[in-house]
C-alpha cells in the first residue's frame, strides 16, 4: 500500500522503504549493489509502475546521535519536533538554500538527500551547525 503524503512505509521484510513526496511520485529507498536496480525493485514490489533509477543523482548524508535534531534545527525550516516529524516522516525542504529531502528513520536519526553537486555544501552546513551546537 502506498504511504500518505510526506510519510513512508516499509515492505514486509523491511528491505524497501517507500517515500511519498508528491501525488504521482513515490521514491524507493533501499540497499542494492547491482547495476539493474530498476529490475530488482520491480521484482521485489511486483507492482504495475514505471521505475527510474535516480541513485546517481543524489548525495546522501545520515545525521544521527542524541543531538542530531539540535544540529538540524539550525538549518532546517520545518518543525522537527518528535511530535510533528515522527519516525517515518519524509519531506522536501530547503536547507541552507539547497533543495533537500529529509527522512526520519529513527528516534535520533535522519537521512538527508540533496543533488550530488551540492553534497559538499550540505555537509559543510551540517558540520558548521554541529560545531555551533556541540
Task: Go through the PLM ranges and name each one.
Residues 1-134:
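Basic, glycine/lysine-rich polyanion-binding surfaces/domains
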Amino acid at each position: 500500500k502506498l504511504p500518505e503524503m510526506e510519510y513512508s512505509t516499509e515492505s514486509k521484510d523491511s528491505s524497501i522503504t517507500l517515500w511519498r513526496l508528491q501525488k504521482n511520485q513515490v521514491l524507493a529507498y533501499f540497499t542494492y549493489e547491482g547495476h539493474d536496480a530498476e529490475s530488482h525493485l520491480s521484482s521485489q514490489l511486483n507492482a504495475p509502475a514505471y521505475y527510474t533509477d535516480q541513485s546517481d543523482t543524489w548525495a546522501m548524508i545520515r545525521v544521527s546521535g542524541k543531538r542530531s535534531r539540535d544540529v538540524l534545527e539550525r538549518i532546517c525550516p520545518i518543525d522537527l519536533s518528535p511530535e510533528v516529524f515522527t519516525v517515518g516522516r519524509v519531506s522536501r525542504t530547503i536547507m541552507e538554500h539547497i533543495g533537500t529531502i529529509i527522512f526520519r528513520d529513527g528516534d535520533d536519526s535522519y537521512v538527508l538527500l540533496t543533488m550530488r553537486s551540492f553534497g559538499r555544501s550540505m555537509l559543510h552546513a551540517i558540520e558548521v551547525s554541529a560545531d555551533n551546537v556541540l
